[in-house]
Amino acid sequence: MPDTTMEPTKAKKVLIIEDEGDMCLLLNILLNGKEMELDHVKNLSAAKEYLLNEQPSVVILDNKLPDGFGVDFISIIKNAYPAIKIIMISGYDGSAKDVALENGADIFLEKPFTRDQLYQSIKGLMN
């Protein structure tokens, strides 16, 4: 007799690369309970190490980080893990949008953004 038990839907993994504690907390609050598993790291070095072991569906990437700029890290992610979708977030430099998109970011959100903008962006990339 076939097994008809339903396995729970596996949550999609989202990696947040953000060094500011308040912003990281806000992102966690905004996305909590949205059927996704959230992980976060505070710099690009930690992100590289994380990606060696885990491949999230989506990366939320801040631009200004302690050990470099997110816009420069986009092409590294895309070359090594082309299936990963990237949402670049930045509040410092609107001109980073063009560079981020040219380097392979799927979406650019300028801070401040709304909960709906963030959630709809992630949802759209996961479908």
Regions found by a protein language model. Give the residues of each.
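Acidic catalytic/metal-coordinating carboxylates
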Residues: 43, 69-72
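Conserved acidic carboxylate
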Residues: 18
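Alpha4 helix (beta4-alpha4-beta5 surface) of REC/receiver domains from two-component response regulators
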Residues: 72, 92-109
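Two-component/phosphorelay signaling modules centered on CheY-like receiver
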Residues: 21-39
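Acidic, metal-coordinating helix/loop segments flanking the phosphotransfer/catalytic sites
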Residues: 40-58
